[in-house]
């Protein structure tokens, strides 16, 4: 049905699903309703739907397709399947490949080590023991740091372990038993590993007591720096374990879901309680979501718990969903109890979840949310830029040059869509390199076109981008260039300018501008990504045998490779080992050691 042909009479008053499409046939939004006629009619009434996202949606919608079903449960399932199929912009869609932060001990090695991993299934096996999931990667790293301080287990890779001939510096720091060179017995190592396992299982009271006594003793002896170190370690343990007792709730396994919406932004928070202990919170920000709260939450619950290894016995929601079959859709054998308590401890837990969602929205989410209203007002942006690409390049005096772009999509950075280009030596300056990157990017049809591109540069880069896109016959892509501060890039940013179509000479925004801060964050992320890729390329190039080193010709190179088998091992050889190579002078060895230092610095 074309929107121009809409009439309530042609829509049946039956349960079903509706798909709203644009002029190209792309599905923008998928909704469900008990009564399709009543629901769809509200979109065409001036006061029918108060959601702020609806004007954006209706402006783009040209066609509405309806699918009839027997009941609301069928509508919910069909809506969920269609959302996964079409990925509409205005619906909530969780990633199906969500993994969890865990720690794992591999049992296949005689001297096991503890690793941070990401996995879809948080289960142990004969080959490895898995602990978690933990709230974040930071929590995993914190635990590893604490384990390293208290349990001197190895941290090196299996390859490094097998080739090491003398203990590393961690042994000297008493943070490793040096099993690589048999400085400890397997029984001693196994005993230390068992203590670490007990720690990861939550038996931390002994360590905490020792730390508290150490803090008290160091303070009495006025060793305040040492006391501070013990105190920080104590806090690390408490923060990493994140097991705060909430005994008053009397729940074994429960999730509490909080929902916070403001303007175009939405945050859903899931508080996880297991065995009566609060393990942490997970936050899910969404932008431009057009679903009603009940539809949003039911869709979220279906997608979220489809990716969970274990479903809790009880799920608390901020309001009743009135979908009787929903628990059985999540787990047929052991359907969870889904309820919305209005009083008591359950209500307190829901309030806590909502407060967490609101706090997340006002801090980390808001700091990265696209300030569309300010963008529309200052840059005269016509349509919401769903996909933004930010470009930068990096090189060292023209060598090892790389160009990159990062992607901001669906109100978040999308690292999986970041791209890198090795810039040819013919691109003799920044503008030529930038032209090459843009030309190669937009000659490819594998990635969707952006609505806006942001450039790390000033007026010249902005002009170059316009010329390149014009040459490629690309229109409708807004170009914004953000100029670095001329005097000191790391200092105040108040002198930075934005260049765009309506401000070809640049506009200077106040440092408090959300729009300026948004572009700065994109620029900084692109710069970080470009530098990291440049360093990897330099490091990789330095490890190639053809890398030119003054004084090292073909004969000496062959002698080195005969001894060390690969150029990478040459870059890891000690001075004493290099001195055994026939024909190498002291100057040659000095050059090789300098090149080694360069590689090490790049890998840091």
From Swiss-Prot:
The UniProt entry, under InterPro entries, shows: GIY-YIG_endonuc (IPR000305), GIY-YIG_endonuc_sf (IPR035901), GIY-YIG_UvrC_Cho (IPR047296), RuvA_2-like (IPR010994), UVR_dom (IPR001943), UVR_dom_sf (IPR036876), UvrABC_protein_C (IPR050066), UvrC (IPR004791)
Subcellular location as annotated:
Cytoplasm
Residues forming the GIY-YIG domain are 13-92
Domain of life, per lineage: Bacteria
**Which GO biological-process labels does this protein carry?**
nucleotide-excision repair; SOS response
Q: Which GO terms describe its cellular component?
A: cytoplasm; excinuclease repair complex
Sequence ranges assigned to domain UVR in this UniProt record: 205-240
| Pfam (any one) | HHH_5
Keyword list (alphabetical) reads: Cytoplasm, DNA damage, DNA excision, DNA repair, Excision nuclease, SOS response
Q: Which SMART domains match?
A: GIYc
Q: Where is the signal peptide?
A: none
State one molecular function term (GO). DNA binding
Against CDD domains, the record matches this protein to: GIY-YIG_UvrC_Cho
* Family as reported in the entry's similarity comment: Belongs to the UvrC family.
Give the protein's biological function: The UvrABC repair system catalyzes the recognition and processing of DNA lesions. UvrC both incises the 5' and 3' sides of the lesion. The N-terminal half is responsible for the 3' incision and the C-terminal half is responsible for the 5' incision.
The protein's matches in NCBIfam families, at most eight in alphabetical order, are given as: uvrC
Subunit: Interacts with UvrB in an incision complex.
The protein's name is UvrABC system protein C
Organism name: Chlamydia felis (strain Fe/C-56)
